[in-house]
Amino acid sequence: MAETKYEVTYIIRPDLDDAAKTELVERFDNILKENGANIIDSKDWQKRKLAYEINKYNEGLYHIVNLSAEDDKAINEFDRLGKINNDILRHMIVKRED
């Protein structure tokens, strides 16, 4: 079965300190790896102003993960846990064509 490439972008609360942010990113990278994903790269993008207020925040820290996976198990688990984590304001998962 061929691996599918994905891009995961998520917005982290801006008031999270550096240690907590690093721990959050590592935890979600490990969730992807433990569920069969191969992480190509995981990087901070930048702190950006949001188009609209989310949970009383006007800005957020963007993080991007590029990965490949044979099935959608890792993506589904990330989606499930991303929805219930209060430190992640929003997340988006896109299937890449390249």
Curated annotation (Swiss-Prot):
Instruction: Please give one Pfam family short name.
Output: Ribosomal_S6
> Please, which domain of life does this record's source organism belong to?
Bacteria
Cellular component terms (Gene Ontology): cytoplasm; ribonucleoprotein complex; ribosome
What SUPFAM superfamilies has UniProt attached to this entry?
A: Ribosomal protein S6
Q: Does the record's keyword annotation contain Transport?
A: no
What does the UniProt keyword field contain?
Ribonucleoprotein, Ribosomal protein, RNA-binding, rRNA-binding
**Could you give a single Gene Ontology term from the biological process aspect?**
translation
Mention one GO molecular function: small ribosomal subunit rRNA binding
Q: Which family does it belong to?
A: Belongs to the bacterial ribosomal protein bS6 family.
Q: What does this protein do?
A: Binds together with bS18 to 16S ribosomal RNA.
Quote the protein name from its UniProt record.
Small ribosomal subunit protein bS6
What would be the name of the gene that encodes this protein? rpsF
